[in-house]
Every structure is written in structure tokens, then in C-alpha cells.
Regions:
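A late C-terminal transmembrane helix in Major Facilitator Superfamily
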Residues: 194-233
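Small-residue (Gly/Pro/Ala) motifs that create kinks and tight helix-helix packing interfaces
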Residues: 1-3, 26, 30, 101, ...
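C-terminal transmembrane helical hairpin of 12-TM major facilitator-type secondary transporters
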Residues: 143-192
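Juxtamembrane helix-start elements in MFS-like secondary transporters
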Residues: 111-119, 171, 202, 206
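Juxtamembrane intracellular "pre-TM" segments in multi-pass secondary transporters
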Residues: 38-82
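Helix-to-loop junctions at the C-terminal end of transmembrane segments
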Residues: 129-142, 228
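Symmetry-related core transmembrane helices of the 12-TM Major Facilitator Superfamily/SLC fold
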Residues: 13-32, 238-253
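Extracytoplasmic gate region of multi-pass secondary transporters
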Residues: 71-134, 186, 190, 220-221
Length: 263
């Protein structure tokens, strides 16, 4: 890091400060900004406060008549399908996040701050794409085609990246396409469990989906490293990740969802 030694601090200490301070600031803001109950949230419209209060009351009434255990979630095919889909998505998320700097370093020969700036380019476009996709999904009330479509576009980006070699501009375009689409999956994906499970079943389902899915954070990068070592290049690993996104699209497209109202 270029900040290594600045103000007597090592590079890793600056890294911890850069990652930790925003979280501390967000925690203080949250303490004063968030409320204990929906009816106290002045930043919500009266209609939104009323809807949320009624939904919470309905969930409490459902919980009074019984609860869904984690064991019941283990027996749910829907939960396992969603867990598998989330596993595939998380595999790509962490693989690209952890390996992209190395891929661009090998292709460009850049290091330090210049490499960091180069690596951020795809994620700048990703921020805008996530907002656009999420808003469009909310406006239309459509969920699974947004997830499946983003997965397929992300797969195309990875396939293009696998064939880009050391062409830095083409790599940037490929990963921008991949991340803009693939990262947009997650906000819409988490609207699916409540549609399929509902009530208290959603809580146990969320826990299992999140637990199983996050294993992809280990499996994906490890697979990339193993294939890089055995093949000598990044292409095979990216093609495997692309195939995973195609499978994700097929899994989500096969789900039968209730119709949701556009916002």
C-alpha cells in the first residue's frame, strides 16, 4: 500500500482504519436514525407504516399458532433450491472479488494504487446497475426473470473474460458486464424466500439459505486457485463460474412464484 509508513502506521493498519471507521460511523448514525417500532419511523409514509405494522402483527399471530423449525427447512425442496442458487451466486461474488486484482495485475503489470483504481472500474458501474435492476424489479413486480436474466448476462461476461487473455480493456469490459449483472442478483434474490415460504417459515429458511449459500465464499475462490494452478491460466475457472450462473438461472426460472404487485 502507498500509505505504508504514513503517520507512523503500517499499510495493514491503514487498511483496518479504512474498513473499520465507516462501520463505526454507520453504527452511530443507525443508533440515532433507526426507531424501535414502525409507527415511530417518520421517514416512512403513513401508508408504509400502517402496512408494516399490520404485517408484523400478522406474523406474530401466525407464530402464536406454531413455529417452523430449522429441521422443517431441511426437508423443504424449495429451501434447498434457493440455497443452491445462492451458493452459486456467492461463489462468483467472492471469486471475482478476490481474483480480479490478480488477473488485472498479471494482464497490465500495474501495482499499488494504480492497480487498485483499475480494479474499481467495474464496481463503479455495478453500483448503478444494482439500483436500476432493483428499482425495475420493484416497479414491475417481477422477480425470477430479473434474477435469471442477470445470471445469464453475468455468465456471458465471464465467458468473454475467459477469452480476453491479457487484453486489459476487454477484461475491464467483460468484468464490468459480469459484475453489473451478477451483483444485481442478490437484492432481488432475497425477495424470493418470503414469496415461497412466508410467515415464520421464512425466518428458518433465510437462516439455512444464508448458511449454505455462504459456503460458496470458500468453494468458488478455492476452485479458481486450483484450476489456475493446474491449467496455468484463469480461463477454465471463469468458465466454470459462468456455467454456475447458467445453472443458477435455470434453477430460479423453474420456481413457481405467486404474482406480486408492482410498486
Amino acid at each position: 500500500m502507498e500509505l505504508d509508513g504514513a503517520l507512523g502506521l503500517h499499510g495493514w493498519q491503514w487498511l483496518f482504519l479504512g474498513e473499520g471507521l465507516p462501520a463505526v460511523i454507520a453504527g452511530v448514525v443507525t443508533l440515532f436514525y433507526l426507531t424501535d417500532r414502525p409507527e415511530q419511523a417518520e421517514w416512512l409514509s403513513p401508508e408504509a407504516r400502517g402496512w408494516l405494522t399490520n404485517e408484523m402483527a400478522r406474523d406474530r399471530a401466525a407464530a402464536a399458532h406454531g413455529h417452523v423449525t430449522l429441521g422443517a427447512s431441511f426437508r423443504s425442496a424449495r429451501v434447498w433450491l434457493l440455497s443452491f442458487a445462492y451458493f452459486l451466486n456467492t461463489s462468483v461474488t467472492y471469486s471475482v472479488f478476490l481474483w480480479l486484482p490478480r488477473i488485472l495485475e498479471d494482464a497490465s503489470g500495474l501495482r499499488g494504487v494504480r492497480l487498485g483504481l483499475l480494479t474499481t472500474i467495474p464496481f463503479v458501474f455495478t453500483l448503478a446497475a444494482m439500483v436500476i435492476v432493483g428499482r425495475h424489479s420493484d416497479r414491475t413486480g417481477e422477480r425470477k426473470l430479473h434474477v435469471a436474466g442477470c445470471a445469464l448476462v453475468g455468465a456471458c461476461g465471464l465467458a468473454l473474460a475467459s477469452a480476453s487473455g491479457s487484453n486489459v480493456p476487454l477484461l475491464l469490459v467483460s468484468f464490468t458486464l459480469c459484475q453489473s449483472a451478477q451483483r444485481s442478483i442478490q437484492p432481488v434474490f432475497w425477495t424470493l424466500p418470503p414469496l415461497l415460504l412466508g410467515g415464520t417459515a421464512a425466518a428458518a429458511g433465510f437462516a439455512l439459505i444464508n448458511a449454505v449459500g455462504n459456503l460458496g465464499g470458500y468453494a468458488g475462490p478455492s476452485m479458481m486457485g486450483w484450476l489456475k494452478e493446474t491449467s496455468g491460466g484463469y480461463g477454465p475457472g471463469m468458465l466454470v463460474l459462468a456455467g454456475g450462473l447458467v445453472v443458477l438461472a435455470a434453477v430460479v426460472a423453474s420456481l413457481r412464484l405467486p404474482q406480486t404487485r408492482p410498486n
